[in-house]
Amino acid sequence: MFAGLPSLSHEQQQKAVERIHELMAQGMSSGQAIALVAEELRATHTGEQIVARFEDEDEDQDEDEDD
């Protein structure tokens, strides 16, 4: 799967991590916190985008089991 992701500086990445930790400290699950911060970043980011490829490890394991 390919996805367009915001290209973030180290400082922006650090702020995102801190925001995730704040949300988790308030009782939000890690998955929800990550999703919310990702949504916020996509909505407000005006810089460059990078393309990333994600591979589903489960699919690879399923294929290995079929052999």
UniProtKB/Swiss-Prot annotation:
Stretches for region Disordered: 48-67
Which intervals carry biased composition (Acidic residues)?
Answer: 55-67
InterPro entries named among the record's database cross-references: UPF0181
- Please name one Pfam family that this protein belongs to: UPF0181
Q: Which family does it belong to?
A: Belongs to the UPF0181 family.
Q: Mind telling me what this protein is named?
A: UPF0181 protein KPK_1966
